[in-house]
Each structure stands twice: as C-alpha cells, then as structure tokens.
Amino acid sequence: MHDLLIRNATILDGLGGAGVVGDIAVDAERIVEVGEATSYGRTEIDASGWCVSPGFIDTHAHDDGAFLRYPGMEFKLAQGVTTVVSGNCGFSAIPRDPQADSVAASGGILAGLEGQFTDLEGYFAAVLERQPAINNVMLVGHNTVRSLVMGEEKRAPTEVEMRCMQQHVTDALEQGACGFSSGLIYRPGRYSETQEVIDLAHMASPFDALYTTHMRNEGDGLLEAVDESLQIARASGVHLHISHHKAAGRANWGKVRTSLAKVDEALAQGQRVTLDVYPYTAGSGRMIEYFNLENPSPELAEVIRIASCPAFREYEGRMLKDIAVEIGMSLPDAVQHVLMAPKGDRTICIQFLIDEADIETNLVHEDMMIGSDGIPDLRGQPHPRLFGTFPRVLGHYVRARGLLSLPEAVRRMTSLAAKTFGLSDRGVIAPGMWADMVVFDPHSIVDTATYDDPKQEPDGIGWVIVNGQVAYALGNHLAAGSGKMLRYRRCAYGDDD
C-alpha cells in the first residue's frame, strides 16, 4: 500500500509533452510509480477530470521574512506553488546582524526577520523550526551584503571591504545559496559601479551558481541595463537570470522586443541567459526609489497606488492622486508627505507602467519563466500577484488568450525553473522525483485577486502536495508543515545546457 495515490489524472509531466491519463503513487516523500496503479493508497485522490503537474516554482520571490512570519505560506500554496526562490533584487535574509533593523535595511521588502541567525545555516534552521508549508531556495543579495559591510555609503568599496563582501557571498554559496542577486535600482546597490558587481558575481562561478538581477534601469535605460547585465555575467563567468523583464513607462513600450533580441544574440553566442516575468501591467517596489524627493514627478505620482505604508496605514490600498485630493496637496507634495514621514522610506507602492502587449511578447519567449515578485506584507494591501500569479497565467494567458499551450506553460513553471535553479529531483513527474505536485482544473483555474481586493485565493486549484504530504485540499490549508530548505546543486537533470 502506498502513502498517497492519485488516480485517473491527466498527467502533465513538466517536460512539455501532452497530458496522459494515469495514476501516480507516492511513498516516503517521493514519486514511486507513474502509469497504472497496481496497489492502493492510505490516502487517495480521485483526480478524474483534473490535471496534475509538478508543483509550480516561483522563480522570483521575496519570501525570506514570510517564512518566519507566515510559515503556512497560504498565499503561495493556494496557487499551486510548492517551491520559491527567495533573496531576489539584492535583498536577502542573510548575511545578517541580528541587532540591526532588518526592515529598514530592506526598505520594507523583506518585512521583519525574527531570530538571532546570521548566516544561511542559521536562517534555514530558524525557518524549519516553524514547519514551513513549502520549499525555499535562497540567493544571497548584493544590497544586503553591501549594507552589512559599508552601510549606505555612496562610494566604491575599499579593497578590504570588497574582500569582506566577497567572503560573505562565498559563505552563503558554500552553505547552499543558488546564486548572487542584485537590485541595482535600489540603495545601496545603485551606488555600485559595474566592476563591483562583477567582482562579487564572480564568487558564484566556482559553484556554477547564478547571477540574478533587478537591472539598473527598466525604463528609458532598459537596453543599456541589459548590456550591463550581460557584461557582468560574461566577465564573471556565470549564468545570467534577468528578473521581471519589462519596459516601464509608455515611452518605452515595445522595447522588450529589442531587449529580448539582445538576449537571443547572447544565447546564440553561447552565453547562459534566462528570464522571468509577472503577468500584470503594474509593478511594485520601494516607493522612495522611484522619485526625486526634491522634485517628484507628478506624471509618475498619477499612477501610484499605496500597498504598504507604516507611516499612514489608512492610505494602504488607495491611489496617491485620491489621497492628494483628500489632504489638499499637489501630487508632488503628497509624495513628499508620504516619503518624508517617519518610516516613510519603507512605503511599498504599486505602479501602473507596463504594456499588456509587452507581457505577451515576454511570455512567448521560450526561456521565460514565471516569477510573482510578490512582497508579502499582509498588513497592507499587496499587489494581487502575491496571491494570483500562476493561476492568472494558466487562466488568462493560456486558456483565454491561447498564447501558450498548457503543457508548455507548465514546463516554464516547473522543469525549466527547476533546471535553471539547480533544484535536484524536482520539477518533473517521474519515479524517483520529490513528490511536489498540484492538481488543478484546466477549465476553471483563474486568479481572483484584484488591486481592490488582493488577498483572494484563486479558483481551480484542487490539491497541492509538498514532499509527499497533502498540504492543501479543496480550499483547506492542512498545516502539513512538509516544506524543506533546499540547497543548490547544479544541474538537476545531469546536464548544463
């Protein structure tokens, strides 16, 4: 008798092939049989009429703090996500000074980091004590490392400081981080020259780990930023992963075709490059990074929505232009009012700056994965992508728009992501693989989270299995606590291309 048996499912194995009706047996956290079951299960799921695929892998998450604050990870589990990649945009839980203000250091992106850990080993131990619902693999962040060594200094590092930063990066990689991330739009990373990033990304090369980047510019300077990212990866000898690829601002719409052409040229020359995208026309991030406080842009302020604002909780979920009218201020004055208040620099905003056509251009690129980029501060009104990213791709862009076939979309969310991030024995339904799976209805799966009501779980997800345990069943979170902290190993499927 098997621990778990899923019967009569349309199996999408994650490799891009058509679905095949069959059964899946699980024992001791792993898939042991795929095809026609020859036994019974202690727990059985009749998946007639449902699809089963590998659990979705969120390649761009900021869940470092969420694993400590919300170990049930309901906002990810309910959309079929079984593994996330945290530590993105240059902000990671480690390395860390436990006495420092982690919220201030990340500008609110990581929320609070509880515990006395200082390195990846300690962080993983702290998370596992809380019995997380899903799996996590970590990047080590440039902004975090730089802040720990140099504070917010607007200058190049000294030789001693560089060696110290390199050691922090190496320590994290030795403990199992999957790569080095940068967020060059954010402070203090924005103060770095290209060579500094090369010198740090180079530490990932002996581990065959990744360099992931929130590029220096995603608007007017997008193409130059892509060139810089490719240069950094070439010079440091590592795989480049471009985060949340987009062209922000109406004047830049359509540029993604040119930036993707640059990526394709690099691929043709043998450089390893992958990307991810979120399926929304609005982004979200630290509001202070988008404005010149001395002269805030009224045009940008016009499209800003407040997601999380410790200084003015009553503003959360509202458009800044409406707040400005209410308090009798111009838009530039309202920007200063929010950002210059105590803790105002921790404000997270939503910006409506992306073209729908560009999202579709991104999604059809064969090396494009899906990353939510959700910022999990549930006290505010977060971007709906935190709850809806993966069902939105399958419901809107696959079923309604027909941009991708269902098997290909699943491949992007599973085996491609697992291979890219070195997640050994995950991302494919086959005997011997870890039993991370999602059972969903391809005819009804869709996001329900909106900007006005973002904390809504999607429709069409039936069951989610994490390391062989049923963690979510028909709308119920089962507190299985079966998530693992994953250590990087290149390459999951025995090759490197």
Explain the meaning of each model-derived region.
Residues M1-G55, Y70:
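Histidine-rich, glycine-flanked metal-binding segment
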Residues I57-A61, V84-S86, N136-V140, F180-S182, ...:
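Hydrophobic faces of well-ordered beta-strands that scaffold small-molecule active sites
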Residues S92-R96, I109-A235:
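Hydrophobic, small-residue-rich alpha-helical packing segments that form membrane-like cores
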Residues A47-G115:
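Metal-associated gating/positioning segment near the N- to mid-region
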Residues P95-Q116, Y123-F124, N143-P157, H168, ...:
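Polyanionic/metal-chelating signatures
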Residues M1-G22, V26-D27, N292-D497:
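Active-site microenvironment of metallo-dependent hydrolases
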